[in-house]
Amino acid sequence: MGAAKVLLVVLAVMVAVPNLAEGRSPPQCQYTNCAAVLCPAVYCANAYTPPCGCCDICPPQKYGGGYRPRG
């Protein structure tokens, strides 16, 4: 019975670790002061940009973008 219990714990950790890693992703965002025309569209399409949208990578003083965490 001891070996089965250890196996269950190992499986639980294997399942939990990826979920914890996902929890460290950038915060969900809502758009604030975002005009898409002010941000070059290519920035929004690049895979390395944050998932929240164009505002994430446009400095407010330069492009009129900006974002804040939800909640």
UniProtKB/Swiss-Prot annotation:
Family membership: Belongs to the paralithocin family.
Stated role: Has antibacterial activity, mainly against marine Gram-positive bacteria like C.maltaromaticum (MIC=50 uM), C.mobile (MIC=50 uM), C.divergens (MIC=50 uM) and C.funditum (MIC=25 uM) but also against C.glutamicum (MIC=12.5 uM). Has very little or no activity against Gram-negative bacteria.
Protein name: Paralithocin 2
GO biological process, one term: defense response to Gram-positive bacterium
PTM annotation (Arginine amide): residues: 70
Disulfide bonds: 29-58, 34-54, 39-52, 44-55
This protein's UniProt keywords: Amidation, Antibiotic, Antimicrobial, Disulfide bond, Signal
PTM: The amidated form is probably the active form.
Signal peptide (UniProt feature, chain positions): 1-23
